[in-house]
Amino acid sequence: SAEGSTNRVHKFDADGNHLLSFGEWGTEPGNFRQPHGLAMDSKGRLFVADRGNDRIQIFDQEGNLLDVWHQFSRLSGIYIDENDVLYGADSESGSVNPDHGDWVRGIRIGSAITGEVEFLIPDPQPDCRGTCTAEGVVADAHGNIFGAEVGPVGGIKRYVRPIK
């Protein structure tokens, strides 16, 4: 589980017993500012959407930092499918927070193995002030991508992944 108030990640076993915790508030690698989502790849690596630091941090099962990626932008939600395709929901870049450089709000799709971003599904309401696009994201085996939206619109939107 990711706990935003203490900026730590906690690991539990299947019976709910606490195994370990790691991280603290900060901007250095291994620290967090609003860990907002978690996902596991096929290798058992833990991907943490560290939204406040505009990055993904990747850890092993013991909480050791393996890598830090910035190319997926400011993620609120993260999902990795059985083929190690990474889906990241950025609900705060662009018109919501112009300080986040040239990032465009939307869902980024790429590789959990190489870190390459392959596609962007832009926010369908790019001029909306506030959080209007997906904060949560998941995909099914048929290529449908679902975004859980918050803000004035709310609800679930379905997107179809572009064919390469």
Question: What residues fall within each predicted segment?
Answer:
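Eukaryotic scaffold repeat domains enriched in small/polar residues
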Residues: 1-164
